[in-house]
UniProtKB/Swiss-Prot annotation:
Part of the 50S ribosomal subunit; part of the 5S rRNA/L5/L18/L25 subcomplex. Contacts the 5S rRNA and the P site tRNA. Forms a bridge to the 30S subunit in the 70S ribosome. This is one of the proteins that bind and probably mediate the attachment of the 5S RNA into the large ribosomal subunit, where it forms part of the central protuberance. In the 70S ribosome it contacts protein S13 of the 30S subunit (bridge B1b), connecting the 2 subunits; this bridge is implicated in subunit movement. Contacts the P site tRNA; the 5S rRNA and some of its associated proteins might help stabilize positioning of ribosome-bound tRNAs. Keywords: Ribonucleoprotein, Ribosomal protein, RNA-binding, rRNA-binding, tRNA-binding. It comes from Desulforudis audaxviator (strain MP104C). PROSITE patterns: RIBOSOMAL_L5. HAMAP family: Ribosomal_uL5_B. This is Large ribosomal subunit protein uL5. GO terms for cellular component: ribonucleoprotein complex; ribosome. It holds the Pfam family Ribosomal_L5_C. The keyword tRNA-binding applies. Belongs to the universal ribosomal protein uL5 family.
Length: 180
């Protein structure tokens, strides 16, 4: 069992049950999945950019990314319906817990001038999205082997019913949220 999952069972569940007065342990919010997305505008001109980003994302997550395609044609961005414009990976189970553990304890502390993540990025349904400006904060990525610095969006999908519950849940699992 991953260290984060153990922490969830031993510390987070009792603390959340105490604070929110849940009657059943199944009411306690849990992490359902983590979705990592890289939107790539440059893939329109440079088709090889997708392959390099795919290798980076595969190295970070340990899972094969899925290519996302344009839903509609947009002349202003020079994209047509069906063009490859990004990548995404959905992590669940033990891979998800391992990734979140690495993100909180290894990757985020490597961000320059890091003072915590924004507490305002909740969507109203208990999900949290974190934007990263570069993939280099992950120790698996070798600085000499990358072709371009790319950002990514990481969405934490929780079973929380409100943002307040999700905020407390993420704080308890160790997410360094800035005080708002």
């Amino acid at each position: 069992m991953s260290g984060l999952k153990q922490k969830y069972i031993e510390e987070v569940i009792p603390a959340m049950m105490d604070k929110f007065k849940y009657r059943n342990v199944m009411e306690v919010p849990r992490l359902e999945k983590v979705v990592i997305n890289i939107g790539m505008g440059e893939a329109v001109q440079n088709a090889k950019a997708i392959d390099a980003a795919m290798q980076d994302l595969r190295t970070i997550t340990g899972q094969q990314p899925v290519v996302t395609r344009a839903k509609k044609s947009v002349a202003a961005f020079k994209i047509r319906e069906g063009m490859r414009i990004g990548l995404k990976v959905t992590l669940r189970g033990s891979r998800m817990y391992d990734f979140v553990d690495r993100l909180i304890n290894v990757a985020l502390p490597r961000v320059r001038d890091f003072r915590g993540v924004s507490p305002k990025a909740f969507d109203g349904r208990g999900n949290y999205t974190l934007g990263l400006k570069e993939q280099l904060i992950f120790p698996e990525i070798d600085y000499d082997k990358i072709d371009k610095v790319r950002g990514m969006d990481i969405t934490f999908v929780t079973s929380a019913k409100s943002d307040e519950e999700a905020r407390e849940f993420l704080r308890l699992i160790g997410m360094p949220l800035k005080p708002h």
